[in-house]
């Protein structure tokens, strides 16, 4: 139980100025040769009202002096007894240690707090039932290399202990200890170092392993292969690069990367490979049923164009892996759209035609993109794929209705009219009336006026009834959106038909009424 005095000392944070040295000594708040003691917060003290120390540092000093009264006071102030023991060991104050050894229990718990090797060894010696092996294991754990150096002769004779310490140094990542053991006494096998480095993702240890291995002048090809397989299987790019400094086959890395879907590895190395090698790994990806992202990455480095199609299909069937086909089909569409835009914008009509044939792109698709980019030359050149002029006109006429842009429609109609004008007169007659109605519907006044002139060249027997029917059909097509020029042309020809007695006055008036209602 705490005495009343202890309770007061524990909770007293401010010392009255009137307290002299005698009063402080009576209260137990005076440290001989140092001065008054005052608590500051939970983990600091004030000595002589001007020197601030951490409570634990003060405990170490008190322990070193063997001053149990100050130790007890500082323990009341939430100090750590372990620091008092460390100080006692430094000052050889074993009487003080014996007073508290029952409270300590396990002296191994103090070892992490000790900085110097001599005190470390003295502390470990307090554990009566521990020998040299235990000391060296703890020295390894807490990086106390001087202790290991002290026992170098014993370690050189005890091979098993040396190998054990080396493995522990790997597990605890004690690089100085690793270097010292290998460089002074050597270990039987460095594989344990590499295995632990890989499992812990410790690149520093991994690199150190190769330095030590290189010092032996024994970098085996089989070991490099094993390391490349392990590190690539885990997707450890920097470990792979470190291994490749000493040799090894990059194909091993890429095979593992494909198998385990490590795209970071793939992306790094694929850029360095020729197309033929990338196709080989694409086949492996199909065989291993790689993920969609892995397949996409491989295909992207091939620009989604695979030359060994037959072999690819054989792998797809043999390994029942159809994902690559789905990706190719989907990406091929998207890629062609993107490529078409650039082709039409920058390439000549001849070059576009060549690529269109190579990739089996439909001419309608090319023409629509060319219309969008206002490339009249490509529209004309591509349309020659239909050798028959009448078929060309029919195909282009069907496309007019699918084009959203007005400027595109006008351009296409000009191209169509140019094709029409190059027809022989007998062939023109086959399409002129259909084209005339299209021109009215699309407000193409110039082309409509021109085609009406051609109609007048027909002999009267054929001209009169067909032209009259054309005018009647056009009246059904015109709308409020029809341009004034179209209406003028229709009015002119309706009056002309009346003059030629092809229409009655009643028909003429009805037509004009419909035209301007």
Swiss-Prot record:
The keyword Ion transport does not apply. Induction: Expressed in the late phase of the viral replicative cycle. Keywords: Late protein. InterPro entries: MGF_505. Transmembrane segments: none annotated. It comes from the Viruses. The keyword Coiled coil does not apply. SUPFAM superfamilies: Pseudo ankyrin repeat-like. Belongs to the asfivirus MGF 505 family. Plays a role in virus cell tropism, and may be required for efficient virus replication in macrophages. This is Protein MGF 505-2R. It comes from African swine fever virus (isolate Warthog/Namibia/Wart80/1980) (ASFV). The lineage of its organism: Viruses, Varidnaviria, Bamfordvirae, Nucleocytoviricota, Pokkesviricetes.
